[in-house]
A protein has these predicted regions:
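Bacterial N-terminal signal peptides that target proteins for export
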Residues: 7-21
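Extracytoplasmic beta-rich repeat domains
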Residues: 37-42, 47-71, 98-112, 135-151, ...
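Conserved beta-propeller blade signature
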Residues: 76-79, 116-118, 155-157, 165, ...
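Structural signature of WD-repeat beta-propellers
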Residues: 80-82, 120-121, 159-160, 204-205, ...
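C-terminal motif of bacterial Sec signal peptides marking the signal peptidase cleavage site
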Residues: 29-32
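Beta-propeller domains
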Residues: 80-91
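Short loop/turn segments that connect beta-strands within beta-propeller blades
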Residues: 89-92, 129-133, 168-172, 213-217, ...
């Protein structure tokens, strides 16, 4: 019996010794992996404040877990939160009306000043008139967090399956759709469409800026960023943010790509710069 206990104790000591040696070897290995040349955090650089905004008013419009964006017109601010759509007075922030959507709003608001469009978590686009009265809804082909583009007699929606669909602003009838292509991996980033003299501008996940006419036909397809690298992450080149447009120029930016400015009528290159953007251009 004593001999058995003695052997058991020896076995325990041997196991502890092996564990201790393994731990010591791990520490030595980690120490060998460290380097005295490790990068220290960079010093913060001074910057000059270009704009000093002042709060004119605030208003509560409920909660949001998506990319809900207010739409501003000459006299109104249209905003969404929860399952509600609001019209607020632009100058005072006072609520003019509140409309209840069919379910939680996940994308919006799009407006032309007379019609307001949002997308709900049921995968439906809903349109309301200037008084907040519901007009129509239509089922989409996929989910989206991109605000609808409203105007020119159309409500245009871009969905996650790279489809762009246009509906009649009055009846909700589908006018046309355009099917794009996307790489295997795309960036989850804020994105919006815009009107331009060339038509509807829509940034694509393949690093291109697409312009569609009011009939849904491509006007041009401009390269903003080109994929480079080996991994899918290194090759992310989504066009991000909202294209900036005036009568002469339109500019767009791509993640890990370029800032490109083109003629707003034909898409011909004016200038570009190597800029890695996650928000898009603002002027």
């Amino acid at each position: 019996r004593r001999e058995a206990q003695h052997n058991e104790m020896n076995t325990m000591f041997a196991k502890k010794a092996l564990l201790g040696a393994a731990a010591a070897l791990t520490v030595l290995t980690l120490a060998g992996c460290s380097t005295p040349d490790s990068h220290e955090p960079a010093d913060l650089q001074d910057f000059r404040e270009m704009v000093s905004p002042k709060v004119s008013w605030t208003a509560s419009v409920g909660e949001s877990d998506g990319y809900l964006t207010p739409a501003v017109t000459e006299n109104a601010v249209y905003a969404a939160g929860g399952s509600s759509l609001y019209r607020l007075d632009r100058h005072t922030g006072d609520k003019v009306w509140e409309a209840e959507a069919g379910s939680r709003i996940v994308a919006g608001v799009g407006t032309d000043g007379m019609h307001q469009a949002v997308v709900t978590d049921r995968g439906e686009v809903e349109v309301y008139d200037a008084e907040g009265k519901f007009i129509w809804r239509a089922t989409l082909s996929a989910e989206t967090d991109v605000p609808p583009l409203v105007g020119q007699g159309l409500v245009v929606v871009k969905t996650s399956d790279t489809r762009i669909t246009a509906f009649d602003i009055v009846t909700g009838e589908r006018r046309w759709h355009y099917q794009g292509q996307a790489p295997a991996l795309t960036l989850q980033a804020f994105n919006q469409m815009a009107w331009s003299p060339a038509g509807i501008l829509a940034g694509q996940a393949n690093g291109r800026l697409l312009a569609l006419g009011l009939n849904g036909k491509p006007v041009f397809d401009a390269v903003i960023g080109q994929a480079a690298g080996i991994t899918e992450v290194e090759r992310l080149i989504d066009v991000v943010g909202r294209p900036w447009v005036d009568n002469q120029l339109m500019c767009a930016a791509a993640f890990q790509g370029n800032l490109v400015c083109m003629s707003s009528t034909n898409g011909q290159l004016v200038w570009n710069a190597k800029v890695d953007s996650v928000t898009g251009p603002v002027a």
